Amino acid sequence: MEKKIDEIDFEKAGGIVPVIVQDNNTHEVLTLAYSNRESLELTRKTGLSWFWSRSRSKLWQKGEESGNTQQVKKILVDCDQDALIYLVEPSGPACHTGERNCFHHSLL
């Protein structure tokens, strides 16, 4: 069932929702980012990953500086409508460190 942007609960977390970014082919988790309404609208309009930077308080497109863009193939919404998954085709590493994904450190 397709959801509308108006159904996403941005207010639960102060105007943003978490976005899990996964490789469309392997389903490997690449990163966790955040989206507000505007970045989600840009993602749907352009087909590229756009997010809200909590530390810089601004919109950013994945790959705008590095060239490592993510073509969004599908957006999934969780049952509470307050979290998203972007299934993407990455053009390069997801992590700013150059690692394929942002989860390359182990805690246990």
Curated annotation (Swiss-Prot):
EC number: 3.5.4.19
Cellular component GO terms held in the UniProt record: cytoplasm
Keyword annotations of the record: Amino-acid biosynthesis, Cytoplasm, Histidine biosynthesis, Hydrolase, Magnesium, Metal-binding, Zinc
Annotated protein name in UniProt: Phosphoribosyl-AMP cyclohydrolase
Enzyme class: hydrolase
Source organism per UniProt: Cenarchaeum symbiosum (strain A)
InterPro entries linked: PRA-CH (IPR026660), PRib_AMP_CycHydrolase_dom (IPR002496), PRib_AMP_CycHydrolase_sf (IPR038019)
HAMAP family: HisI
Keyword Zinc: yes
GO biological process, one term: L-histidine biosynthetic process
Binding site for Mg(2+): 78, 80, 82
Molecular function, one GO term: zinc ion binding
Cofactor: Mg(2+); Zn(2+)
Signal peptide interval: none
Keyword Hydrolase attached: yes
